[in-house]
Amino acid sequence: MTTARQAFTEQDVEGFFDQTHQTYLDFWDAEGVLHTGYFLGLDDDDYRAAAQRTSDVLAADGGIDGSSYVLDAGCGCGPFLIDLARKHGCKGEGLDLSSERINFARKQLAGANAGLDVTFTHGSVTAMPYEDNTFSHVVSQDALCLVPDKAKTQSEVFRVLKPGGIFAFSDFLQPKPDISERGRTHVYDRVRWNSGFSYLGYQQSLIHTGFEMVLARNLLTQIRQTYRVIGTMATARAAVTDNQVEKDWILAFAESCGEIELAIDRGEFGWGMFIARKPA
C-alpha cells in the first residue's frame, strides 16, 4: 500500500457519507443497496439483481445459516444484514461510521416487520463495542478499504470472531502503488479513500493477522460493469432532477463512473471477494 497525498481520517469518511447519504439514495438505490454487483455478463445491466447476487455469493461462500451470529462491519444502510436475517434466520449486528446510514438502517429494520434479531450501532470497526469471540461470521461489502488503519481493522475482526469463525467480505483493491492524478481524484479522493491492498496483498495481510485463507476471487470485470451501469443510471437520474445542486453532484458522479472505468483499465482500481477463517 502507499499513502495518498492527503491523509483522510475516519472523521473525513464519516462526514462524507453523512453528507451524501440522501443523494446516493435518490439516484442509486432508494433502499440503500450501494455495493458492487456480480453480473452475469457484459450485456447484463440489471444492477439490483447483480447486487443481490453479490450478497448471495458471500452468504453461500461464508456458510451462513440459521445458527450464525453475524457482524456486518461497515454495514452502511443495512440491506445486506437484513437480507441475511430474513433469508437464513441468523442473528445479526451492524456497525457503521455514518450515523445517517445507521439511522436509515434502523428505519428499514423497523419497516421489515418480520421479528428479525438484528441491531444496528454507530461506531468504528477499529474499536468495536463487542466482546472477544462473539461472532460466528463477520461480513462486509466494499467498506473496509475506507478505514485508514487497516491493520487495526483486521485485528478487531479477528478478535470478535469465535475460534473457527469466518470473515467473508468484498472490498475495493489498489492493484499497484502508483496512482495517476486522474485516478486519485476520481476514485480515491472522491470517497476519502487513502489507499488499499492489492489482490495478493490483501491475502498476505489477512494471513499476517492470523487468518487462514479459504477462498479469494479477483473480480475486475464485475466492478467495471457495475460502474458502467451505475454511470448510466446516474445520467438518467440527473436528467429528471430539478434541484441544481443535486443535479450537478449526480452529473459529477456520472463523470467519475467513466473515469473509474478508465482507472480500472489502467490497473489502478479493482475488486475482490475473500473468505478467511480464524483458526479453531
At which residue positions do the language-model features occur?
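A short SAM/SAH-binding and catalytic strip from SAM-dependent methyltransferases
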Residues: H137-P148
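A short acidic, Gly/Pro-enriched loop at the edge of an enzyme's catalytic core
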Residues: T126-H137
